[in-house]
Amino acid sequence: MIAIVTDRPNVGREIARVLGAGRKENGYMTGNGYMVTWTYGNMLSLAMPKDSGTAHVEWKDFPLLPPSFLTVRHVKTDTGWNPDINAVLQLKVIAKVLNACDTIIAATDASREGEMLFRHLYGFLGCKQPCLRLWISSLTDEAITEGMANLLPCDRFDNLFLAADSRNRADWLLGVNSSYAICKAVGFGNNSLGRVQTPVLAEICRRYRERENFLPADSWPVFISLCKNDRILKMRHVDDLVVRREALALYEDCKAAKSVRITAVGKRTEEIGAPALYNLAELQKDANRYHSLTAIQVQEIAQGLYEKKLISYPRTSSRLLPKDVYDTLPPVMEKMLSRKEFRQYADTVDLAAPRDSIEAQDTMEHHAIIITGTQPGKLDREEMLVYTLIVGRMLETFMPPCKVEYTTVDAVCAARKFRIRTYRILEKGWLGIFEREHIVAKGRMPYQVMPEFFQEEILPVAGCSLIHKKSLPVSPYTDEELVDYMDKAGLGTVSTRTNILRTLLERKYIRYSGKYVVPTPKGLFLYETVRGMKVADASLTSGWETELARIERGELSQEEFLDGVLETVNEVTGEISRNHPVEKRPQGTI
């Protein structure tokens, strides 16, 4: 008998169906020589200090080290944090299934986290059977069948597990030590720090404070209007004057002027290629920008579409495709273009066009997000929005470039320089899918029929205007901006960033105000407590992902990595103890 372990019930049932294991039991499926069971996500975690009998922590006890055992996931109940009863019961089912089989197939998420989940489960239950790895990028029947026919040895993923386990231990070391240290320093225990969550919270709070303390600045832009070929064009003074008296004087001079002299005309045509295929971060950003979906919603929706066999594995950082996957796309695209909503693009799609979408070599990393050949059934509104984004991006990738003409005209009026910058689209190409002209506008005004201007041409002034402007404060972060910030700062991965935001929300450090993410009073208190300290600095651990990638490649040992982490932990806890002498406050004070 062969056991198969997945990390979601619906994934387990889908694999069981394909393999003919159709008999439903309590917590698993069986039949045709297979027993297929599942976890409910990650049900095990590194033990906390209290789990090994450490009730009180003194400064001399730092750095705290993780106990050498795992514990069942805890959930908050009326009586405090207790083991999740659903996890406890399912672990018993999994143990029963694994004990009844002589071979185990790991079919958990094909990722670092999925590998760690299985390895922790395998060790926690004391398994000794040989194991194999199912590594697939979609849940179509074809992908499952092909994956089962090409199972991989588990030891091929040893370094992947080491990278995941190293990241897990490093997060424990920094998060637990800094949290215990800050709670001890400020005298109460309802604060939590983390190597990614704290820098993200600090950045959210920093921008919030910047907005609160903002003082608007005045400026007075001056415009002139000129007429040519019965078309009125408005040109702007190249500098927005900040002294009202000077702006008013320029305005009066322009009113008195009879003509404007064209000093320069610049035109250039640019071919703008389609954006690359989606990875999770780019999908989250676009779904937030265009449809106001949060990063958490997008990841959950994308996971649902994956489990419905409609898209490939979503939690990927790649925007490329291996050649073997690329070569399977023509029939998928043809099937998609046969649908009435996409039929109009059938003549412009070029399936041989985007060769730069192909990876130089195949890797075990998941490729860019693409649709599968499975036709969507009934999807809810938000699912359809995300699915349409993915379909649209694939169409864009296989369409010709967008051709745009950019024009800049400079002129002199009243001895001062004015300018107009316009664009017009000559050939839409891929831009025709969603008609989002702002992508190619580059801050210019649209002008589809621009009059022809000539250098040294003299034209009459048709009017002028003076506007009083006040600068606006920076807006609070949106999900799009937060995902972009974390991506550029090297904070977390595409798989973990959503959980960071979820943690900050659950711990009531941040909240949503419309589409914006703002800190709560509790979050602001924690920010003021750690502001300027290493634990709130995004650069403190930004190099970790590079080192974890080296562990994956076998270029760095776990011991070397964790030795460096311990040095960082000592620096962080030492700084907290120096900056915050013990100061007792009532429990729950913020």
PLM-predicted stretches and their roles:
Residues M1-N168, W172-L174, S465:
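Intrinsically disordered, low-complexity regulatory segments
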Residues V11, I15, N86-V97, A110-L121, ...:
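Helical mechanochemical/support elements of P-loop NTPase systems and associated helical scaffolds
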Residues E14, V18, V97-A100, H120-F124, ...:
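Generic, well-ordered alpha-helical scaffold segments in large soluble proteins
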Residues R23-G27, C154-N159, Y180-K184, R209-F214, ...:
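Active-site phosphate-binding and catalytic loops of NTP-dependent enzymes
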Residues M35, M43-P83, N191-Q303, E307, ...:
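Long, highly charged, low-complexity internal segments
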